[in-house]
């Protein structure tokens, strides 16, 4: 099985909250697709709550589009990581980490501005596979923590696992 890019970085050295360019690729038509690692929690030390991350999934995707989409950037998808330490965001374009961090902070403020659970988009059995597994309170707690901590940048060069380590795993 091929080694995926996300498993070639040392998770023991990741900072959080932090933005990382996980991957960049060109399409056959010449557009650039960039995948960002939006790390909310330090791997193997913290985890996002099940209900909180699910509610963030519903809110974060729209709010990030509000703050990041432009003539040169279009978000394709924002999805939670299976390890529940953050989200992957795939987009067309090449925004800098600082631009992404600013959009992320603005989106977290938007999460804090949501008044009631009923205001969570697509919160119904037709549009959500586990529509009862949500908590606006937990999502807002996550948002407060991100805003209070600020957002750093993780760089692949600082986190890459050596070939020697990878061969031994």
From Swiss-Prot:
Documented EC number(s): 4.4.1.21
Gene Ontology MF term list: iron ion binding; S-ribosylhomocysteine lyase activity
Residues that hold Fe cation according to the record: 54, 58, 128
Matches recorded under Gene3D superfamilies: S-ribosylhomocysteinase (LuxS)
Catalytic activity annotation: S-(5-deoxy-D-ribos-5-yl)-L-homocysteine = (S)-4,5-dihydroxypentane-2,3-dione + L-homocysteine
One Pfam family here: LuxS
Cofactor: binding details: Binds 1 Fe cation per subunit.
Keywords from the named record: Autoinducer synthesis, Iron, Lyase, Metal-binding, Quorum sensing
Cofactor: Fe cation
Function: Involved in the synthesis of autoinducer 2 (AI-2) which is secreted by bacteria and is used to communicate both the cell density and the metabolic potential of the environment. The regulation of gene expression in response to changes in cell density is called quorum sensing. Catalyzes the transformation of S-ribosylhomocysteine (RHC) to homocysteine (HC) and 4,5-dihydroxy-2,3-pentadione (DPD).
Family: Belongs to the LuxS family.
Name of this protein: S-ribosylhomocysteine lyase
Highest classification ranks of the organism: Bacteria, Pseudomonadati, Pseudomonadota, Gammaproteobacteria, Alteromonadales
């Amino acid at each position: 099985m091929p080694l995926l890019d996300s498993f070639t970085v040392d998770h023991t050295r990741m900072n959080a909250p932090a933005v990382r360019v996980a991957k960049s690729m060109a399409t056959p038509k010449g557009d650039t697709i960039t995948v960002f690692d939006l790390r909310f929690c330090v791997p193997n030390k913290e985890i996002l709550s099940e209900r909180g991350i699910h509610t963030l999934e519903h809110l974060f995707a729209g709010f990030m589009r509000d703050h990041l989409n432009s003539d040169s950037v279009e978000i394709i998808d924002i999805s939670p990581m299976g390890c529940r330490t953050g989200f992957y965001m795939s987009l067309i374009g090449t925004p800098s980490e600082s631009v992404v961090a600013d959009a992320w902070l603005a989106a977290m403020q938007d999460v804090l501005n949501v008044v009631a659970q009923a205001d969570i988009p697509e919160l119904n059995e037709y549009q959500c596979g586990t529509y009862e597994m949500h908590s606006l309170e937990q999502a807002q707690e996550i948002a407060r923590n991100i805003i209070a901590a600020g957002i750093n940048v993780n760089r692949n060069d600082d986190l890459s696992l050596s070939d020697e380590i990878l061969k031994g795993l």
